[in-house]
Amino acid sequence: MGTLVKQECFKLFKKKSTYILPIIIIIIMLSLAILGNQYSDVFNLKESFKGGFSSFSWVVFLMIIQASTIISMEFHYGTIKNLLYRNYSRTSIIVSKFITLLIYSLIIFLVFIIISLLLHLIFNGETSLTEHSKNHISLLNSMLLTALGTFVGMWLVMSLTLLISCIMKSPGVSIAVGIVFYFAVSIISGFLTVVIDKWEWVKWNPLNMMNIMVQITDNDTFKKITKLELHELFIGNFIYIVIFLVLVVVAFKKKNV
């Protein structure tokens, strides 16, 4: 397994998109910080910091792309045959891809968190990161919680993207499905709230689980909408992620080479 993970990491970090897309996101982060410094009445640096200067939103798209191509490209270029000829089991191959994506996603989040801290110190250093008010948590805690909620919700999207990418031949389809799933929460949130109010069991659907990204920093407000406590959202996300990844393993084992 260790050898497979090293090989997958090598292939991932050899791709230009692995570096180009994060660099683009960093440029966007820097741009928002500069705009916030110049036009504080339009761009709120505190709110921008909480969202990692928008990096926590963009990173989801980055990981959807990586998840959609990590499987489909193996079959597109026929490199999957080389792995199978070396007597690696299909389960080991696909699990190594999961681990590689986990490693990459952790690195990316850590990089964006560090850059967010640096940008805050440069452009808004006079504002305390650790000061608590009576009704609000500190800026640092808010940013870290947002990162955690986004990370969990992102993996829910990624697990579905991996499943679609394993079933379909085109990575474009899985990318589209992942992006639609990501935006679906905000698009149908009003409708979903009405449905959950009428049939409370619907609250366990995967779209509602995506609300962990916002509820994690404002539990009192959003639990009235999701009808779920924060720990229930974490458990629900974990269960759905495991289910989707297990289905990916099953689909991968049955996929024709």
Specify the residue positions occupied by each region the protein language model found.
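Aromatic- and glycine-rich beta-strand/loop motifs that create alpha-glucan
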Residues: M1-P22, S170
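Secretory targeting signals
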Residues: I28-T69, V95-C166, N211-N237
